[in-house]
């Protein structure tokens, strides 16, 4: 048993249930002894068995009567330190009564009995707790024998304070005696000014009630209610500040509401508005259904359930609570100037929103505001209600179709930013006419918004640019010979971009299939996009007619010498100034239309056509780069950038265009060309193919604008092509990739020599310096640089 350290209180004066696990000292020799060990007090008692107590003893327990002696069982402790008046038997041993005499004062005896009972009860209660709090509790109990219980004095002090508060505020608050003591605490801690501000108002009301009578009190309360409703209505949201502030500390607010209800018991009428007001505030959004004005909120909730996004819910919430509070405060509600202005503003907003139904959020706001204003003015007929329902259904279908088409285009394209711009432009072509007509039929005056004006301007610019783009290529196409646009340094960037866009144009065979694919895809596209695609179809038809007319005259030239001579002559002719000015004008015009053009080019580059063109160009470039001693390969198939082709001579560009067109139209013929190249017949094989497809390439170089518009239309309709056209495009995409990888092996020397000679003859022994384009630059950055160069 532990015999070191301090004594265990329960072992010596009660029963310790811990036994050996008790960290305090259990010593049988010291049982019943009340003498403190002096060595232990000095901290140097190291005896194994010490008969003295290792514990501070403040009381004479021999003078305290034993609690268990008065119990029916009696005291069963052999060494009990308390006073026993009767003799007892413990384990067969006879123990005589205690020799010490108790003090003579009977009152003190009773107190000692009580304290002894307290100690025993506390010892029983805290048997399982740690011994250090045991000692503290014992010391507290022993020291507080003659002191009254600690809970009593604070009660006395609080009562006195309450009495003083009652004396101070009796004239103002009457029965309220305890709320003043509780009121300041929320004011100090939480800053709940609303709660405290409400209370002085109530006290003033009661003071006036005492002085002037009940009628004036009712009038004052009705005025206060009106003021409160105005203040709460002026808040930014329908929920008032009284609701928002008490949330961090709900306790004081509840008590405050209770006091207000108790105050109002003098007059029965104003009690109901107060309670209803707090309930409607706590209900939040549902409070709209509490008032009598329930029809507009129901329609608003229907519009919200149908999935429309409501743009300004706060203002709608504002208006209904104001009406409610007005009806509740008094039977007759006089509208204030602010309310009338707000209603007019809401009606104007509703008119504007009906005209802006092309946009989703405004269209969603339109139905609730319009119905609300009309319901406040007049009752609608049944036919009008039916017309409105049909109108809403049409709007919803239109929005769904828009969302479907935009989602399809977004999922097909890899770069999100570039793809978003084109569908919006295409949609805006057909969109503004229908909603404007509808809005005019509904309301007389049509006020154009800024967005509508911008859309119309963009449409005008686009149409003018398309018409000018059509006229310029026709002017350039007057001479029947094939032209190679060649501009040094400045317009080279734009030319390479145009080459990339022209490659996407197809010869007559593929254009027919593309038109069929466009027609099938038109069925899936919604109304606005049909207009843009149909326009592009008409452009394509004109294009193919022109090609067929020119094809008859151009097929006669089939020899390699004639091709070379034509190219050389056209090269020298193009080096002149008029063509250069025309191209610079085109580029300048393009620079003006940067937002529309860049979005269309982004669409072209990221669509499936772009991939096939790039793969074809890879195949063509690998053939051409054999002629170089140190080829620079800078082609990234994952990111489709037509601009990133390395330095090429003028003839190389022409060859690249021809080979790309051949590969795009006839993958088998291009593969045959590439397979014949190891047998030293590349130059001979290329000639007939070039002569056959010459009208195509010529017309493409002559109408750069048409090809850009056409390719943008193809790119717009490409993600929605049917399954029939899918394999053909994938064929053209996969075959050149394989061929290019195969053809990058060991090139024969004869093919290289042929290319070297051809290029050297055309360039006249001088390869002009070309622009080295940074492949990391974006399409928009290059266009900006081009426009700056042209302006300077």
Swiss-Prot record:
Which keywords does this chain's UniProt record carry?
Coiled coil, Isopeptide bond, Metal-binding, mRNA transport, Nucleus, Phosphoprotein, Repeat, Transport, Ubl conjugation, Zinc, Zinc-finger
Skewed-composition ranges (Basic and acidic residues): 308-331, 345-360, 393-405, 431-443, 492-501, 545-558
Zinc finger (C3H1-type) locations? Answer: 2-29, 31-57, 60-87
InterPro entries with a match to the protein in the record: Znf-CCCH_3, Znf_CCCH
* The organism's place on the tree of life at top rank: Eukaryota
Per the record, its GO cellular-component terms are: nuclear speck
Composition skew (Acidic residues), residue ranges: 160-175
Coiled-coil blocks = 338-360
Knockout-associated phenotype:
Homozygous knockout animals show embryonic lethality by 6.5 dpc. Homozygous embryos at expected Mendelian rates are seen at 4.5 dpc. Heterozygous mice do not show any overt phenotype.
Crosslinked residue numbers (Glycyl lysine isopeptide (Lys-Gly) (interchain with G-Cter in SUMO2)): 114, 124, 140, 454, 601
- Entry's localization field: Nucleus speckle
Q: Where is this region: Disordered?
A: 103-191, 223-331, 345-443, 458-531, 545-571, 690-750
Residue spans with biased composition (Low complexity)? 367-376, 717-730
The biased composition feature labelled Polar residues covers 115-135, 461-473, 698-715
Chief location of this protein within or outside the cell:
nucleus
User: One MF term from GO for this chain?
Assistant: zinc ion binding
Residues found modified as Phosphoserine: 108, 132, 149, 171, 289, 346
Q: Name one GO biological process term.
A: poly(A)+ mRNA export from nucleus
PANTHER family listed in its UniProt record: ZINC FINGER CCCH DOMAIN-CONTAINING PROTEIN 11A, ZN-FINGER, C-X8-C-X5-C-X3-H TYPE-CONTAINING
Q: How does it assemble?
A: Interacts with TREX complex components THOC2, DDX39 and POLDIP3; the interactions are ATP-dependent. Interacts with PABPN1; this interaction retains ZC3H11A in nuclear speckles. Interacts with KPNA3.
Q: What's this chain's function?
A: Through its association with TREX complex components, may participate in the export and post-transcriptional coordination of selected mRNA transcripts, including those required to maintain the metabolic processes in embryonic cells. Binds RNA.
Report what the protein is called.
Zinc finger CCCH domain-containing protein 11A
Organism, per UniProt? Mus musculus
